[in-house]
């Protein structure tokens, strides 16, 4: 048979190799835990406080940790089909926030219409946990009003801006699961943050959005997601139908196993 012939040929080639077999190709594991990736990090990355390198996953090209620097980058957005890892991604983000920050250094506001993150945010880190649209509109308006008090005024010196020490308090992480259930015809709570997104690094604001893949290419014209794209925010594409078309920076989704993703970075590409 063909398979027997191929096996015979491979064995003959192996017998005549002078230098022995070459190194085996390393592939991404089917499953990996956050603890597995943490074990690969240098010691100085393990327990920093006040932000730093957040683990997003394992990078395929070098099979090393894929990191997100919270001191230089503020936001993330992710698209994926059902049961491909959207909520698990947010749970990992929550775990990383609690690793990188103390409760005095960071607070989390979660907008979670399906209650998928119920119990995931430690109480000492929770600023708000919102599960309905009306509360989300009200709470986000209040949060945005407070964050505007951190915007640098004319009296703030260039040195203060470099050191970001004209305000004090925790950084705010706004985590939004199922964004398609949040941004509706009844309004979008995140519109209150729209003008703050470009200045987020100055005021300690982080916004992380997950959304289903269906209709993603159309959704990117929605104002908040469009701002994310304009700011060249790192985007993540989990498994999805390629027919959806270009979603992030011209990149189309593709079918893959749960947890496997394309990461679109402004400098590194895909």
Regions inferred by a protein language model and the residue ranges of each:
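P-loop NTPase catalytic phosphate-binding loop
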Residues: 44-233, 240
